[in-house]
């Protein structure tokens, strides 16, 4: 078994524990206590208008959809940084969302029973542009899609 297999086993165990506890998803922390990622998605917070996502040095896997979010944020003029996040940063975030190949872009409404709230304006804006891009409605992101004749 290779190390990436162990990563996914740990993620799935965390997901099972989260669901048993009544949550939809688990947020994984690094050994140093930094927010790393969710079980199959990257995590983002929005604080003071800036999108922040954990770096790979915190244990986050680099994500294809994460890179799409970075590109969309840049195109929209929204500051985007990779930086260490503490669990408490999730509690005080203005907005939070996750992204992944299967999940796409999903707002986070609460963490540890602490309400973040409805999707905020930046999450909604990034989510809408992402959905338009994957539907082929945004020519500037046409390199993300391979069109297949049915």
Predicted regions and their residues:
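Glycine-rich phosphate/oxyanion-binding loops and their immediately adjacent helices
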Residues: 1
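Helix-start/capping segments and mature chain N-termini
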Residues: 4-150
């Amino acid at each position: 078994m290779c190390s990436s297999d162990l990563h996914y086993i740990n993620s799935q165990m965390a997901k099972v524990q989260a669901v048993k506890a009544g949550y939809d998803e688990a947020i994984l922390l690094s050994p140093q206590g930094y927010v790393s990622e969710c079980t199959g998605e990257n995590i983002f917070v929005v604080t003071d208008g800036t999108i922040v996502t954990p770096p790979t040095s915190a244990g986050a896997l680099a994500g294809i959809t994460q890179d799409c979010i970075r590109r969309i944020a840049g195109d929209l003029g929204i500051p985007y940084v990779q930086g260490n996040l503490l669990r408490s940063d999730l509690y005080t975030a203005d907005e939070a969302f996750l992204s992944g190949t299967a999940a796409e872009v999903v707002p986070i409404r609460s963490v540890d029973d602490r309400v973040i709230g409805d999707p905020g304006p930046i999450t909604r804006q990034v989510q809408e542009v992402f959905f338009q891009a994957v539907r082929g409605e945004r020519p500037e992101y046409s390199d993300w899609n391979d069109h297949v004749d049915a």
